Amino acid sequence: MSFALYGLGPSTGLHDNDESDTLYKLNLAYMPKENQTWYATVSEGFRRGGVNAVPTEGSFIEEAGWVPFASDSVLNLEFGAKGITKRDVFYNMSIYRIDWNDPQLNTDTPNYSFYAVINGDEAQTTGLDIELKGSVGKIDWDLGYARNKSDLRADLVTPASVPSIYAPKGAGLPGTPEDMVNVGLAYTSYLDNGWGIVHRANMYYQSDMKNHLSTSLGYSQLLDSFTIGDISSTLFSDDMYVSFFVKNLMNERGVTGMFKSESFGPNPAAGFYGSNDREFIALPRTVGISIEKSF
């Protein structure tokens, strides 16, 4: 594959793939009580393969093995229970396991650091989700917790003519915090004129996580944990809502992704004078008023 870069060479490339199979899903549910359900789900998933925009001719050449990547598939197992307790607390709890076969993983090429997807051998995700909702007087509350662990179950090997280990077995998959918590409170009251007012406070927390699968310090960075809080007050009637809100009350930076300057910044030696380094951050503190009217 070649492509025009700095006006050099034609843009060409052709790769085909054709796959056909059947995906299965089985769900079983049992109600031991009227307000309680147990369930189990087994399902399969598939994602097609593709090609990377990696040059193999002309300038900035990479090996041809970095161009195509194959499909991947998953087997998902999930067990859970949901219902309502005697104190009117709604709950939804589940545990799950996802086995990845030939997982498509984001990497970079060795010569000029082009973005490239390659196939690993095996990966696995395990976790649990807990959701609770209830009321105490005029206060409605909700609580959520998620635990997630995702890692490689075999070394990730590059598709080069002389393969090398890009990430070792046991390496955690990027972009997946192990712990996430959300809490919400809402207090509702009514005025003599028929209008109501509801005050809300919400909090979200996530633990630290990796931004990149590579073990190279030029790419990999452990992103800090963060907590984001929102508050709002809404005056409402049957056909109108007036809300005052503050999002990200503490103005938390909340970095969820990063392209480090060491690898994505200027590199005059390679003829690159621009910069592609950046961070993905949470919405900064935002204060506002919204008005809705139904007609």
Give short role names for the model-derived ranges.
Residues 16-17, 23, 36, 45-100, ...:
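Outer-membrane beta-barrel signature, preferentially recognizing the C-terminal barrel domain
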Residues 4-12, 58-65, 110-116, 163-171, ...:
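Extracytoplasmic loops and strand-loop junctions of Gram-negative outer membrane beta-barrel proteins
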Residues 90-100, 118-213, 290-294:
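Gram-negative outer-membrane beta-barrel transporters
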Residues 1-33:
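Signature of Gram-negative outer-membrane beta-barrel scaffolds
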Residues 1-2, 51-58, 103-111, 148, ...:
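Outer-membrane beta-barrel translocator domains and adjoining extracellular loop/strand segments
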Residues 28-31, 44, 71, 81-83, ...:
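Residue-level signature of outer-membrane beta-barrel architecture
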Residues 203-214, 234-295:
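C-terminal beta-signal and adjacent terminal beta-strands/loops
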Residues 26, 40, 79, 93, ...:
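Hydrophobic, well-ordered secondary-structure elements that form the walls
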